[in-house]
């Protein structure tokens, strides 16, 4: 028996053992305090409530039954009952007496002490000639506690001694909190604008001494010495852990020295100087900076450089040029229609000035690096530019560099940059440094020059470039002699000596050959013969129209050998291709850009577009669905065609054949009836008459791959196959049931006819024959028995179909039932009747066996043999027929 309890935030219940069936709330609380170590219960209390009904047990005398689950929560403790004494009114009177005795103390205005009127004479003169600073110490009467001995007893003294530290503690708590301050207005924190509002009319208890003037009778906020620096208490602390060498004596210090003086920490000048040496020097003289970085107005280094964007394109200090435009309403250059809002910040120049000022080296040593901008574009080395086939005017006398296969940036030069530098005015030549321009530095140009020079260069550069292009186009129209390509470089040199823009062929008129085409073109497709710019995309030396499909590799480029054993294509375009050889590949009809195929010319292969996984799965599922839809109607159609063909062959074909030639009908066996038992259906060769079974219909290789690749698709395909096979099996069962009904009806119809034919056959004599019938030997019978057992195991379909013949050929039935037959055909009719009766006996026995097998859940006994047939009753034709049927089964 126990009570289960837990806090609201706890997860599991704790137990408290109990002796009886009930426990009171008070005892339960005491046990909880004891087990949870919550103390004596004076500071907090516990509220107990039922866990199921949330009922709180307020009365501690309530009884809680056993096995009850309760929730407990802690609440603040209830106030305890105070002890009432009879001396309390006397203590209150003592306090009133003390207040009445000390009512003439100055409490209203602590800045100016007020004295009672009896201390002044009738003329208003002070009776005591004591300085004002001594008034608070000598004039203010000290409360005499000794006079209270006559009025109060010993208990009141003890109570006063107890109350004095408590009041002192409350006063100290009020001083340390927010809002408390020293001097005038000190009081209760946070209210009445920081002024005390409760202590003005309260006097300190007996024994309280002011901590400022050491005089009892008033609180420190009412001390008359407030505001006097002579009474300010300086708090000092001992210099623990600080060496004397780091202390400096000063009257305003906060550390007390052993001598009684106060000191402060001495500043560490050595560490300060060391830190100052590590800082970058920003006190460089203005004369060390280049003149381009100085403002033309104030002649100082530009501060917040700004650029005039509508007139002279010069840079000034932002403040200088803005004040100049506002005051004079015109720019420095003299243009008047400019505003201060048209100024643009020159961030490049600002970054340059900041970097030079932060650097510690001289600007004359790295003049070339002044123009560099610390951004991502300049940090990256630009791709090398190919040289133009036409020479500019500026670089006419220079030696043209030869490009190599490897794009080495160290061997590439920039003649166009040199041309721009050399074509610049002479005014900027003083600042420019004539040295080779590196590939990474070519994008930055020359050194930063004055903004006027830069603006002139910007305006003059387009004109000079136009003139250079016109001058460069004239010599380009003349014929140039093509440099002879070495034999070893003819095959795989993608970058020959004569390179066009971006390593492509030039678009202007080039060397003329017999076909008027550029080198490497065979002139097959006129749309790609260099007329349309941007569509050639091939290197000289390559056949431009060698297709991107796998074919002959260079130097033939898709052409075979001619009778002269000379290669065509590549750089050998002096002879026509052999007209009797295979022609080269041409470009497929593809949309632009053709540069993609030009890049793929080296790989000689086209790549398929990337296909996402979702798109591939959707495509595979669609193909599988189409293939299943195509396969399903074909299978049903083939099944129906096979049934119709077999029915026609059983009914019409055999009847017509027997009516035309009765002898031929006796020799040819009836076609086997196809059994559709799904447990005994064998695999056989496909024929137009027999539809393929479900074993022959196998999924394609693609579907197998898909099924192996995607498990979900494999499961869906398996379900579809299973449902289709079940439909086919149900159709087979219905067909077999109909066939069994027809067979039973034919069996009952022919049983009487068979008995009559046997009786008639015994009465008639056997017809004479040239050769007597050869009886079957024992070995042949055993062989037939073994072969039939083997056929029943291996080929159950043919064996059952041959043993379950239910119909008689129309010729034999006609010969038996026709009473108008001639006497000349009596022998043939007798033989036919004899063979027909023997065959019917075998069929009846087999049918009875199959009927019993079907009765027992259609599980035929494989090794059960039908009743043996008398050998003497079986004729030679019957044996020949059985052997022929066995041969046909073996061939099937």
Curated annotation (Swiss-Prot):
Ranges where the DWNN domain occurs: 3-76
Span list, region Disordered: 375-408, 459-493, 623-892
One of the GO BP terms on file: mRNA processing
Zinc finger residue extent: CCHC-type: 210-224
Catalytic activity: S-ubiquitinyl-[E2 ubiquitin-conjugating enzyme]-L-cysteine + [acceptor protein]-L-lysine = [E2 ubiquitin-conjugating enzyme]-L-cysteine + N(6)-ubiquitinyl-[acceptor protein]-L-lysine
Biased composition (Polar residues): 647-666
Keywords for this protein: Metal-binding, Nucleus, Phosphoprotein, Transferase, Ubl conjugation pathway, Zinc, Zinc-finger
Zinc finger (RING-type): 295-333
A GO MF label: ubiquitin protein ligase activity
InterPro entries: DWNN_domain, RBBP6, Zn_knuckle_CX2CX3GHX4C, Znf_CCHC_sf, Znf_RING/FYVE/PHD
PROSITE patterns in UniProt: DWNN (PS51282)
Phosphoserine PTM positions: 285, 404, 866
Major enzyme class: transferase
Enzyme Commission number: 2.3.2.27
Record's GO cellular component terms: nucleus
Database matches in CDD domains: vRING-HC-C4C4_RBBP6 (cd16620)
Name the record gives this protein: E3 ubiquitin ligase PQT3-like
Composition bias type Basic and acidic residues, residue spans: 623-644, 674-692, 708-745, 875-892
Subcellular location: Nucleus
Cross-referenced Pfam families: DWNN, zf-CCHC_2
The keyword Nucleotide-binding is annotated on this UniProt entry: no
Record field: compositional bias (Low complexity): 810-832
Motif position, Nuclear localization signal: 693-700
Organism: Arabidopsis thaliana (Mouse-ear cress)
């Amino acid at each position: 028996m126990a009570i289960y309890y837990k806090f609201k935030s706890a997860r599991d219940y704790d137990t408290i053992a109990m002796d009886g069936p009930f426990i009171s709330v008070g005892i339960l609380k005491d046990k909880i305090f004891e087990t949870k170590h919550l103390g004596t219960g004076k500071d907090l209390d516990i509220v107990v409530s039922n866990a199921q009904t949330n009922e709180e047990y307020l009365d501690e005398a309530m009884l809680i039954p056993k096995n009850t689950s309760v929730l407990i929560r802690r609440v603040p403790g209830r106030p305890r009952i105070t002890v009432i004494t009879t001396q309390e009114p006397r203590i209150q009177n003592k306090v009133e007496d003390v207040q009445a005795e000390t009512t003439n103390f100055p409490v209203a205005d602590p800045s100016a002490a007020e004295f009672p009127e009896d201390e002044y004479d009738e003329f208003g003169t002070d009776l005591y000639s004591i300085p004002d600073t001594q008034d608070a110490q000598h004039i203010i009467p000290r409360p005499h506690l000794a006079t209270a001995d006559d009025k109060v007893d010993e208990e009141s003294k003890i109570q006063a001694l107890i109350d004095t530290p408590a009041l002192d503690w409350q006063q100290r708590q009020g001083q340390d909190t927010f809002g408390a301050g020293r001097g005038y207005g000190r009081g209760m924190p946070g209210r009445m604008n920081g002024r005390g509002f409760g202590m003005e009319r309260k006097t300190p208890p007996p024994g309280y001494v002011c901590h400022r003037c050491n005089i009892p009778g008033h609180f420190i906020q009412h001390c008359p010495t407030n505001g006097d620096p002579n009474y300010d208490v300086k708090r000092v602390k001992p210099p623990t852990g600080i060496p004397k060498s780091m202390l400096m004596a000063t009257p305003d210090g906060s550390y007390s020295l052993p001598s009684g003086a106060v000191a402060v920490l001495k500043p560490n000048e050595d560490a300060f100087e060391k830190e100052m040496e590590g800082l970058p020097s920003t006190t460089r003289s203005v004369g060390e900076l280049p003149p381009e970085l100085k403002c033309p107005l104030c002649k100082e280094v530009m501060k917040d450089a700004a650029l005039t964007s509508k007139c002279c394109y010069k840079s000034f200090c932002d403040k200088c040029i803005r004040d100049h435009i506002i005051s004079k309403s015109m720019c420095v250059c003299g243009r008047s229609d400019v505003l201060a809002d048209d100024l643009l910040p020159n961030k490049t120049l600002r970054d340059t000035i900041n970097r030079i000022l932060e650097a510690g080296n001289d600007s004359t040593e790295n003049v070339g690096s002044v123009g560099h901008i610390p951004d991502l574009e300049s940090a990256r080395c630009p791709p090398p530019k190919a040289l133009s086939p036409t020479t500019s005017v500026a670089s006419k006398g220079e030696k043209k560099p030869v490009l190599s296969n490897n794009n080495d940036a160290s061997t590439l030069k920039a003649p166009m940059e040199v041309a721009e530098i050399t074509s610049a005015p002479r005014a900027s030549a003083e600042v420019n440094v004539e040295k080779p321009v590196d590939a990474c530095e070519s994008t930055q140009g020359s050194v930063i020059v004055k903004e006027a020079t830069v603006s002139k260069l910007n305006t003059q550069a387009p004109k000079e470039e136009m003139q250079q292009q016109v001058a460069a186009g004239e010599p380009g129209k003349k014929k140039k002699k093509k440099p002879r390509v070495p034999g070893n470089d003819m095959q795989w040199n993608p970058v020959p000596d004569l390179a066009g823009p971006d390593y492509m062929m030039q678009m202007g008129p080039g060397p003329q050959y017999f076909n008027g085409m550029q080198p490497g073109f065979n002139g097959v497709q006129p749309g790609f013969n260099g007329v349309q710019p941007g569509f050639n995309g091939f290197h000289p030396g390559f056949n431009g129209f060698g297709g991107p499909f796998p074919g002959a590799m260079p130097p033939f480029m898709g052409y075979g050998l001619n009778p002269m054993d000379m290669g065509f294509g590549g750089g050998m375009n002096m002879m026509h291709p052999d007209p009797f050889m295979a022609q080269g590949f041409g470009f497929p009809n593809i949309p632009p850009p053709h540069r993609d195929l030009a890049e793929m010319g080296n790989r000689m292969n086209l790549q398929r577009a990337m296909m996402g996984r979702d798109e591939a799965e959707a495509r595979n599922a669609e193909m599988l669905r189409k293939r299943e839809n195509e396969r399903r109607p074909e299978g049903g159609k083939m099944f129906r065609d096979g049934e119709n063909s077999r029915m026609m062959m059983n009914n019409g074909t055999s009847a017509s054949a027997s009516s035309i030639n009765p002898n031929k009908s006796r020799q040819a066996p009836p076609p086997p009836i196809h059994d559709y038992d799904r447990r005994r259906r064998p695999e056989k060769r496909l024929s137009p008459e027999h539809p393929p079974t479900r074993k022959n219909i196998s999924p394609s290789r693609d579907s197998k791959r898909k099924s192996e690749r995607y498990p979900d698709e494999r499961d869906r395909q398996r379900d579809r196959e299973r449902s289709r096979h079940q439909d086919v099996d149900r159709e087979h069962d219905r067909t077999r049931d109909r066939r069994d009904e027809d067979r039973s009806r034919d069996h009952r119809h022919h049983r009487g006819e068979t008995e009559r034919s046997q009786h008639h056959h015994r009465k008639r004599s056997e017809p004479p024959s040239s050769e007597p019938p050869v009886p079957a030997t024992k070995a042949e019978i055993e062989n037939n028995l073994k072969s039939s057992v083997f056929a029943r195991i291996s080929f159950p379909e043919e064996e059952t179909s041959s043993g379950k013949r239910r119909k008689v050929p129309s010729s034999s039935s006609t010969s038996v039932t026709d009473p108008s037959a001639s006497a000349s055909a009596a022998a043939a009719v007798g033989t036919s009747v004899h063979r027909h009766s023997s065959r019917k006996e075998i069929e009846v026995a087999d049918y009875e066996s199959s009927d019993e097998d079907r009765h027992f859940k259609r599980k035929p006994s494989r090794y059960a043999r039908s009743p043996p047939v008398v050998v003497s009753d079986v004729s030679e034709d019957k044996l020949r027929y059985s052997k022929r049927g066995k041969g046909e089964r073996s061939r099937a």
